[in-house]
Amino acid sequence: RDPEMSRGLGDVYKRQGKGQLIFKGFANIGAGAKLSIDKDASLIFDNQFWSTGPLLIIARKQIQFGRNCVLSWNISVMDHDAHDIYHGGVLTNTPQPVLFDNHCWIGFNSTILKGSIIPENSVIAANSVITKADFEKNSVIAGVPGMTIKNGVNWS
């Protein structure tokens, strides 16, 4: 770990209510991190979570990280669209959980949006935007929007 980039947790904002911030083991959250948990949301970190530098996580429903997830700098994770959109008086863009399976590596400047599932042992390339959940484990995912560019990978 780089002591210059990993100094500790930044800002944590939790709205009044039953919102939960859960750590299931060791987590290293780098300097400049901002975590926001809505009143009925949950943000869960399993054991061996690592991030460096600026990180933005905003949970309105559920964001969950599996074991041994590694996030580079300038990562954004949101389980919603930031503003409600109505059509005919009906909310059309409800929050959707974001799930990271075990052993995921997220490259710098990446954005992970609502409804995304990052599969086990996967790599998200730098500058990617992930918007869906239909990726296979052991994949490299890259681009805007994110697409599988390689299968059968492993990383350490």
Model regions and ranges:
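Single conserved hydrophobic/aromatic residue that forms the stacking wall/gate
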Residues: 2-13
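Glycine-rich hexapeptide-repeat left-handed beta-helix
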Residues: 65-67, 73-156
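Right-handed parallel beta-helix
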Residues: 39-42, 46, 51-54, 59-66, ...
